[in-house]
Every structure is written in C-alpha cells, then in structure tokens.
C-alpha cells in the first residue's frame, strides 16, 4: 500500500565566500566557507510505501535512479535505521546540475529530514547530519538548517548571522565537475582567516573571494564572460565549484532591474536570502 504524497522544499545555497585552507592526507581539501540558503530550489514529494521499496517516479535524464541522491539518501536511512517502510519519490528539479548551488545535496537532505518524520524514526539532527556526510560534504549544512560558517571539508558547522539580501544568480549553461576543479587547484599559499576575519569580510562584497573561481574561469570561457558582464553592476562571485555566479543586492528592485537587462542574454533568477532552512523545525 502507498500512502498520500507530501511536498517538501529543497532550497539552493550560495557560498558567500570560499577559501581553500589546506589539504588532508587523503586528498580532500580543507575549506572555510559561508553557506547561505535562498528561496529558490527543488521540490520533493514523498509517499510512504508499506512494501519497503524505494521508487523514484521522476528520474533525471542521464542519472540512473540508483545513483540519484534522493534514492541513495532514502536507502541509506532505511538501511541504517532498520526501517521496513519504503517511499515513492517525485522530484521537481529547478536547480541546475553542476552549478554550485547544492541541488543534489539539498534534495538528499530534504529526503532524510522528511523520511525521518514520515517513517517515525525520530533521529536527532546531529545523527542525520552524520548520515548525510556519507552522501556528500554539502549535505550536512542543509540538515543543520541555518546559514553557516563551515570548516573542515565543509562539515564542521557553526551558525553565522547574515544581513537581509537579494541575489541575482546567472547560470552560464556549462556543467562543472567539482572533482575536476579541485584536481586542478594548485594554489600553494593556504591560510585560515577565522570567524572574526570572515565577519569583517562579509560586511561588504568587495573583499569576498572564491579560491576555486580562477580555476573555473580558465577552463570555462562562458563563466569568465558572465563574471565580466556582472562586474558592470557590482562585485560578482562564483558559488561553490561553479558554474553559477551571483551578485548581492540590498533590495529585490535592484536585483530585478539588473536581471531585466541580463535576462535578454543569460539564464538565471532572482532569489531572496533566507535566515533558516524552510524545514528547520522538522528536525530536532
């Protein structure tokens, strides 16, 4: 038997800055980054199944269902909890793949948060975060549920206050592989800034940087072109490992005004920065 569907948001994120500060012996890079949620993203619909099956009803082109992060998240939670229930999954994708907006990670986190409730597991937030880390370094922040300063590989999280803001996000229509970007990252001087320094940098947009941006600009001319165009209006930044780039504004009107000009040439959207994840109160 399949129960009724319930709808859950999976918001995108922006990295307001991203510093590579070291490298672990296993090859993973250590980061300082600030995550901000925005009111744009995907939507998951989930329905409990009594037969224990995990079924994705809306597979993404080019992604086998067994590799989809929502399916992997559901099966991981099912296995680790010993739950006998299953789920039917519908996924409405809006967040571009390979754009640095955390779409897949957010989908996985939403699946874990929602199924934890639908299956009656009552796992605490910290346990879900640890489980999410097995799926990807960006998954825990979406379960953490607050804008955060992240260190380690991105999994050590502390809440950080951010001022209200609107964002114009442009997708250069290229897919960037995170693995390839880090593989080509060759900066040798790696230094930590720390929370106090980061809070000072966040006061304006001029001093913010993404250490991965130069790697992507060299390999993807389309990203370089969009950044050059956006510099006419402010201090743009790439999010994550790319390819999406963004500008921060104090008001929606300002963001909309610039987007009306750029939308004739580029695909993108305007979104408001959030204080917390829409499902923050769904995890404890």
UniProtKB/Swiss-Prot annotation:
Which residues of this UniProt protein bind ATP? 96-106
One Pfam family named in its UniProt record: GHMP_kinases_C
**In which pathway does this enzyme or protein participate?**
Isoprenoid biosynthesis; isopentenyl diphosphate biosynthesis via DXP pathway; isopentenyl diphosphate from 1-deoxy-D-xylulose 5-phosphate: step 3/6
Instruction: Please name the InterPro entries in this protein's record.
Output: GHMP_kinase_C_dom (IPR013750), GHMP_kinase_C_sf (IPR036554), GHMP_kinase_N_dom (IPR006204), IspE (IPR004424), Ribosomal_Su5_D2-typ_SF (IPR020568), Ribsml_uS5_D2-typ_fold_subgr (IPR014721)
Query: What job does the chain carry out?
Result: Catalyzes the phosphorylation of the position 2 hydroxy group of 4-diphosphocytidyl-2C-methyl-D-erythritol.
Q: Which HAMAP family match?
A: IspE
Q: What is the recorded name of this protein?
A: 4-diphosphocytidyl-2-C-methyl-D-erythritol kinase
Species, as recorded:
Chromobacterium violaceum (strain ATCC 12472 / DSM 30191 / JCM 1249 / CCUG 213 / NBRC 12614 / NCIMB 9131 / NCTC 9757 / MK)
Taxonomy, top ranks, is:
Bacteria, Pseudomonadati, Pseudomonadota, Betaproteobacteria, Neisseriales
Per the record, the gene is: ispE
């Amino acid at each position: 038997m399949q129960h009724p569907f319930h709808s859950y948001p999976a918001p995108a994120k922006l990295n307001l800055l991203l510093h590579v500060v070291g490298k672990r012996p296993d090859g993973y890079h250590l980061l300082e980054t600030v995550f901000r949620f925005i009111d744009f993203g995907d939507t998951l619909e989930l329905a409990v199944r009594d037969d224990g099956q995990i079924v994705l009803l809306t597979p993404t082109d080019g992604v086998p269902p067994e590799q989809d992060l929502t399916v992997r998240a559901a099966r991981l939670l099912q296995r680790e909890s010993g739950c006998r229930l299953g789920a039917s999954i519908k996924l409405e994708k809006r967040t571009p793949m390979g754009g640095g907006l955390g779409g897949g990670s957010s989908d996985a986190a939403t699946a874990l948060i929602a199924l934890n409730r639908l299956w009656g597991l009552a796992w605490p937030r910290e346990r879900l975060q640890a489980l999410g880390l097995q799926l990807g370094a960006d998954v825990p922040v979406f379960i953490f549920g607050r804008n955060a300063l992240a260190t380690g590989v991105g999994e050590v999280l502390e809440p950080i206050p951010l001022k209200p803001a609107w964002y114009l996000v442009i997708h250069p229509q290229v897919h960037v592989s995170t693995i390839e970007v880090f593989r080509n990252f060759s900066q040798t001087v790696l230094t930590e800034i720390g929370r106090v320094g980061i809070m000072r940098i966040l006061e304006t947009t001029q001093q913010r940087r993404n250490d991965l941006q130069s790697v992507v600009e060299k390999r993807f001319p389309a990203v370089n072109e969009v950044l050059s165009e956006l510099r006419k209006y402010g201090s743009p930044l790439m999010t994550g490992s790319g390819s999406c780039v963004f500008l921060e504004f104090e008001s929606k009107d300002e963001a909309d005004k610039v987007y009306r000009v750029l939308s004739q040439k580029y695909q993108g959207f305007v979104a408001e920065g959030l204080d917390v994840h829409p499902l923050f109160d769904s995890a404890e």
